[in-house]
């Protein structure tokens, strides 16, 4: 089994992009994903969307990869030719971030990839990492030059607040990413995706001692074994409505990955569509 101290750790879904000096600012309860202690044998296996499957090329054309000091440290979603949305906690001010759109297998060149530099980062104005690293966990990235839109590079649809909320409550979303750990273990080279059921608020609150604010929601499986994980942060949680996918969440955080009785926690996009 998992010891209580280990299971209760809050760990991000970004791979570690912090210098060692910054570790000292974290309480034990906020150990960063990718710096997981050796106490759990299974942490080795949780290096990507857990229990997911390979996407097909162009299946999630809004998905982007963020590269910085660490490759594939987070994901994001294309909003239009010039802007990408991701998780605010993915961003470190001094990191030069490259966005890769049209990516499929990060170890191969498919000639569908488009790389852009990020020239401006706008975290949500109420985001304050020193108070809470995962509250208002959403940020916009402006690209240096527009993406060329095609069947591999397509913006995700965003509905108004009311409809985004309605779609989320349809009950089933898709999450995707190349999540992998910084220190050891396999990485996902091919984009992974997973269908995750929406988890009602009461169940969500009961599952954790950490605060789940109204601008967050839980999704995933009580039995464990399937979840988003390291390096998936910032990537999309989408709901399919009559063949069209809408952005309903941003992959944000979780305690470990795919643990029984724990869920993935996502930023509720409906709160931010009027931003």
Swiss-Prot record:
It holds the Pfam family Trypsin. The modification Phosphothreonine is found at residue 27. The keyword Lipoprotein does not apply. Residues 49-275 form the Peptidase S1 domain. Its main location: secreted. GO terms for biological process: blood coagulation; proteolysis; zymogen activation. Keywords: Blood coagulation, Calcium, Disulfide bond, Glycoprotein, Hemostasis, Hydrolase, Metal-binding, Phosphoprotein, Protease, Secreted, Serine protease, Sulfation. Belongs to the peptidase S1 family. Factor IX is a vitamin K-dependent plasma protein that participates in the intrinsic pathway of blood coagulation by converting factor X to its active form in the presence of Ca(2+) ions, phospholipids, and factor VIIIa. Heterodimer of a light chain and a heavy chain; disulfide-linked. Interacts (inactive and activated) with F11 (activated) in calcium-dependent manner. Interacts with SERPINC1. This is Coagulation factor IX. It comes from Oryctolagus cuniculus. The gene is F9.
């Amino acid at each position: 089994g998992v010891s209580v101290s280990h299971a209760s750790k809050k760990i991000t879904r970004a791979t570690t992009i912090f210098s060692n000096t910054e570790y000292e600012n974290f309480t034990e309860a906020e150990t960063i994903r990718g710096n997981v202690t050796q106490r759990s044998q299974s942490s080795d296996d949780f290096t990507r969307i857990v229990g997911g499957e390979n996407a097909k090329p162009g299946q999630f054309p809004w998905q982007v990869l963020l590269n910085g000091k660490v490759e594939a440290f987070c994901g994001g979603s294309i909003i239009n030719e010039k802007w990408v949305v991701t998780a605010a906690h993915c961003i470190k001010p001094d990191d030069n971030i490259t966005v890769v759109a049209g990516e499929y297998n990060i170890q191969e060149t498919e000639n569908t990839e488009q790389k852009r530099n990020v020239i401006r980062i706008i975290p949500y104005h109420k985001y304050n990492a020193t108070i809470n690293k995962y509250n208002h966990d959403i940020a916009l990235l402006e690209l240096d030059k527009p993406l060329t839109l095609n069947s591999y590079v397509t913006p995700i649809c965003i509905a108004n607040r009311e409809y985004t909320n309605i779609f989320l409550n349809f009950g089933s979303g898709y999450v995707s990413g190349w999540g992998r750990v910084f220190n050891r273990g396999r990485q996902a080279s091919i984009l992974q995706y997973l269908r995750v059921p929406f988890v009602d608020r009461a169940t969500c609150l009961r599952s954790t001692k950490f605060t789940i604010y109204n601008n967050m929601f839980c999704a995933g499986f009580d039995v464990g074994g399937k979840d988003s994980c390291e390096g998936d942060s910032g990537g999309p949680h989408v709901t399919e409505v009559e063949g069209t996918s809408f952005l309903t969440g941003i992959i944000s955080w979780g305690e470990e990955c795919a643990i029984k009785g724990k869920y993935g926690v996502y930023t509720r996009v409906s709160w931010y569509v009027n931003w």
